[in-house]
Amino acid sequence: MRERVRKMKESLRVSKYPLCVEQFRLANESLEQTAGEPMLLRRAKLHAHVLDNITIFIEEDDLLCGSGASKPFGLEMQYEYGVWTKDEVESLKSEIYTISPENEEELYRLNERFAGNSLNHNLVETMGKSLGEDDRLWPFMKSGLVLPPWKDRKGGSGGGFAMSGYGLGPGFSLVCVDYAKILKGGAKAIIEEAKECLHNLRYYEADSIEKRNYWEGVIIVFEAWVRFANRYADLAEKMAADETRETRKKELLEMAAICRRVPYYPAENFREALQSFWFTFLMVCPSPTSTAGRFDQYM
């Protein structure tokens, strides 16, 4: 086993997983700023605000950029499904999760501001009843794949979820996006298509305004996604400037060059394709049933 692989394997042996509040905080900021706007645009701007501001990092020996949370091995406490109670947080702390005192205090402050403002604050209770009563789904709900894990059917999961990724909340269905479309055309093709649709839109139909909001939202999200990749390019270049080891400096500069290209442009080689795929996957998550699809075919 190569030394790099051995070190990365050892880094996976962690006993505690940090709970992060950055995404919760940024979501709250965005929802306050966009109050009264169409929901399609609110969600798009929320997504962009998170991608533009969430903490990013590149760890030692990384060759691909992108983490699903603001801390290594972290889980972002989700904002979509209601506030987090102290009992829920204490339950997680008693298991394999940890949260800093500062973040825990901030979480409770966000709860007070966020109560009733989440995008799906009534969904947990309504879905929880049906999911908890389904014998086939009960082992899944109890597993903790959606945090916090259900202790019993009566108690359910409570109000919050904590997961990894920058999608707009956890899903309860199988999700498989068209990775090949990004690999072959890049985000550039989707942005250009959205702009063309906006240009050609004629306000003759009842849903014309909704179509405009949708295409504007597509542009907002995909342009933010490209900026997210460029943030990693900036970070890799900064780290390379401070790096004294020539081999690692070269690796960081190569990572920066790749992030300048993908996901905006189509991938031109396998390394770029891997990075483009991973950025795409981060945008799909969190969802307990996200899938990479036919990786063997489109790669």
Placement of each model-derived feature along the sequence:
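Long, non-catalytic protein-protein interaction scaffolds
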Residues: 1-202
